[in-house]
């Protein structure tokens, strides 16, 4: 029940008949209106059907419709509001009925508005939760960004240089270890030919010529590695008498070294790192 219904007059029972005077008055008014309608109907019947022109029938109908609407508009402008009845009981019953209809319509509107308001509150709560979650993510990312900026500021060029120098030192130390291990392995498994040295000494004593000092396999490989790394555009080694031929042939046979395509006296190390 709406808040203003307590101000309405007492209910008039639908089962109890209205006062006789009010009923008689309403019946008389209805009969008068009915007589007016009959008179209008008889006038329309007597006027007979109106003949339409052969051309522009649609235009003619539209013009007649405009005339009818204009006449109706003028009648409504001239007409003054009429009271249903002067009887207070009739007016009270009609007013109460209209107020009850309005109250029902307003209650329906209120119920609909409340339902929409409830739904909007739920949607607003969901949106607020989503917004809070997004704000937390933004705050976390902003905090992380500030931390990275601080770290980047503290990470100076001197520190970068020191890190690179330390890594380079470790690489060089590791390289020396590998070369040392390679030298020990080659010295153990690929020693210089003793007989060749002895024969060279004998020939030196007989002919008086200087003997050729052969280069170890370790030294040959180290030269080839250095040439490949320092001068990659020209990594070839020119073969000389102190390069023992069996070592050279072994390197070529096992694919460790390659000959120059135009000069067989020049070899290079296979680029295993590429």
Swiss-Prot record:
It is found in: Nucleus; Chromosome, Centromere; Chromosome, Centromere, Kinetochore. Residues 96-159 form a coiled coil. Residues 1-21 are annotated as: Disordered. Its main location: nucleus. One of its GO terms (biological process) is kinetochore assembly. One of its GO terms (cellular component) is kinetochore. InterPro entries: Centromere_CenpK. Keywords: Centromere, Chromosome, Coiled coil, Kinetochore, Nucleus. Probable component of a centromeric complex involved in assembly of kinetochore proteins, mitotic progression and chromosome segregation. Belongs to the CENP-K/MCM22 family. PANTHER family: CENTROMERE PROTEIN K. This is Centromere protein K. It comes from Xenopus laevis (African clawed frog).
């Amino acid at each position: 029940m709406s808040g203003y219904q307590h101000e309405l007059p007492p209910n008039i029972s639908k089962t109890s008949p209205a006062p006789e005077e009010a009923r008689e008055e309403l019946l008389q008014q209805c009969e008068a209106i009915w007589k007016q309608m009959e008179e209008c109907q008889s006038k329309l019947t007597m006027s007979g059907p109106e003949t339409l022109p052969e051309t522009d029938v649609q235009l003619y109908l539209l013009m007649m419709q405009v005339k009818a609407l204009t006449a109706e508009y003028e009648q409504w402008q001239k007409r003054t509001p009429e009271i249903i009845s002067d009887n207070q009981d009739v007016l009270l019953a009609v007013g109460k009925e209209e107020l009850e209809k309005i109250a029902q319509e307003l209650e329906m509107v209120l119920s609909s508005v409340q339902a929409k308001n409830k739904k909007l509150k739920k949607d607003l709560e969901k949106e607020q939760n989503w917004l809070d979650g997004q704000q937390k993510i933004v705050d976390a990312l902003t905090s992380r960004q500030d931390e990275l900026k601080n770290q980047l500021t503290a990470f100076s060029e001197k520190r970068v240089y020191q890190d690179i120098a330390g890594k380079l030192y470790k690489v060089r130390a590791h390289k020396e270890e590998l070369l040392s291990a390679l030298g020990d392995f080659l010295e153990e498994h690929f020693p210089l030919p003793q007989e060749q040295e002895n024969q060279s000494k004998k020939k030196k004593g007989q002919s008086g010529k200087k003997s050729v000092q052969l280069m170890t396999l370790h030294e040959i490989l180290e030269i080839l590695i250095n040439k490949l790394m320092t001068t990659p555009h020209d990594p070839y080694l020119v073969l000389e008498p102190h390069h023992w031929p069996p070592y050279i042939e072994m390197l070529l046979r096992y694919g460790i070294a390659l000959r120059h395509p135009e000069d067989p006296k020049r070899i290079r190390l296979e680029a295993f790192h590429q």
